[in-house]
Amino acid sequence: MNTFFHIAGTASLSLAVAPATLAAPVWEIDFNKGLETARDGNRTVMVEFTGSDWCPPCKYLRSTILDSPEFANYAERNKLVLVELDFPRTPGKISKELMKEREDIMRRYGVTGFPTVMLMDGTGAPYARIVGPTKTAPEYLEKLTKAQDLKNSLNGEIAVARKLSGSERAAALAKALEKVPAELQGYHKELIAEIMASDPEDRFGFGKKEKEARMMAQQSEMLEQFYLSQRGKIRGEELRKSREEAEKILSSPDLLPPIRLKLNKFISDSYALERNYPKSLEYLKSARDSDPGSKESSRLQPWIENMEKIIAREK
């Protein structure tokens, strides 16, 4: 798992310095309980994904910013529901069951770096993601305030849109959703359902996107199960059979590009283990070409260039 440092309200919301006597904010460690608390009071949930005992940027964020009186005052004034999801490495610090539960949440929200903070409503729909700390607490609070301003603007536009009907309602709701960063829009399932209900002809494409999202979830789960079933098979006949299984999955015409990329990369890695670098390079290129234009595809180019150098040296 990658880390940040690579293992890697309204505008008037106060940034005022807190009194020294202000009590430290309480952090919930149960994600679902935090959402429930937020729903009951229509509050914002601030979720921190952290590695408290091994991640230097996480320690800096906590000691310099989240434990500061400025943040305590901000959290109190804005009634934030604070949730800490810690991923410690100290043996026995948390149970395996709790670690798995948190890893599932991390995957659900696409968290790939520590520390990551996400701001969301009580339904679990996020509208902001902050990766890494800032140098000072006031700088971080500015980021939080901008996120809260976005939320308030979003809610205002939704309220206006709900007074409309038919295609006008769908158009206004879709425009409101555009305020949310593109990578977070898909989590706003209730809002998307509202848009689709007012857009039976799917002019805004959310019906198609929802279908693709369901397929991605199903295929991602299938891929996860495949990885688990192949764990430890790193040599000889077992490795060959693993490739055959991956090839069978790749033969499906409905396989989505990101999944196709990962399977090609899996096969490439298996050939690399056997030092069959030409075949490894072949599948690396297939992986890159499976999802052109994606970040994952662009990240493979250095691998391809390195493999080409290895092959050239062995000639």
Predicted features along the sequence, with ranges:
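Thiol-based oxidoreductase modules, predominantly thioredoxin-like and allied folds used
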Residues: 24-29, 50-51, 64-100, 111-114
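Non-globular targeting/processing and membrane-anchoring segments
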Residues: 145-315
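Loop/turn elements at helix/coil->beta-strand transitions in domains of secreted/extracellular proteins
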Residues: 41-45, 78-83, 112-115, 122-125
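A short beta-strand-turn-helix
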Residues: 27-45, 75
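Non-catalytic, surface beta->alpha helical segment in thiol-disulfide oxidoreductase systems
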Residues: 64-66, 104-152
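Short active-site neighborhood of thiol/selenol oxidoreductases, capturing the structured segment around
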Residues: 41-55
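Bacterial N-terminal signal peptides that target proteins for export
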Residues: 1-12
